[in-house]
Amino acid sequence: LIPYLRRFHKDHPEVRIKIINITSIGCAELLENGQAELIVTNYPNSRLSSHTKLQTVLEFRDIFVANPDYFTMGKSPLSMENLLDYPILMLAPKSTTSEYLHQVFAAQGLKLLPEVELNSNDLLIDLAEIGLGIACIPDYMLRNRPGLEPVHLKTPLPARSAVIAHHEALQLSQAAQCFLKYFSQI
C-alpha cells in the first residue's frame, strides 16, 4: 500500500489522507457504516456485504514460519495434524486470518488452538524469531527474515488476496476515485 500512497500523495499533495489501522473485520464495519470510503482488507472477509465492490491489490498465501534453531522441522512436509503438535502463533480471533485458519483446520476435522494470538504480524514474526512458536504470516512478510524458515505443509494453505473495497451504492469523492485508478494499473 505504501508505494500507492506515496505516489498519490506526490501527485495530489493538497488531499488530506486519513488512515486507520485496524483488522480487516473492523475495516469492513467502517465501510458498511459509511465511516470509510475505501478500505484495504484481506479477502475473503465474511463482513463484506454483497454491495461491496472489490479490486484485487495482491494475491498471497499464509505460511507457517519457524526459527530452525528452536524447531527442527526436517525436510518432509508436515500434515496439518502434525503442525498442531507445536505452539502456534497467529492473529487474534477477531481477524479474517483467524477466521480463515480456523475454517481451514476445521475442514480437515482439526481444532486449531493457538498458543499466542496477537493483533500484529510484525510481533508474530518477532516471537517466532526468538523461538516462542511457529507463526502463521502472509508469505510476503517473510522477505529479509534470515532467522526464519517456512514450514512446509503436505497441503499448502489456499491463496487469499488483499483487496481495495468500496460500497457500490455510495458516491466516492473525487480523491477516492483518483486513488482507485492507481490500482487499475496493477
Task: For every predicted segment, state its role.
Residues 51-88:
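Flexible hinge/capping segments at coil-to-helix
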Residues 1-46, 117-118:
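Central regulatory/effector-binding core of bacterial HTH transcription factors
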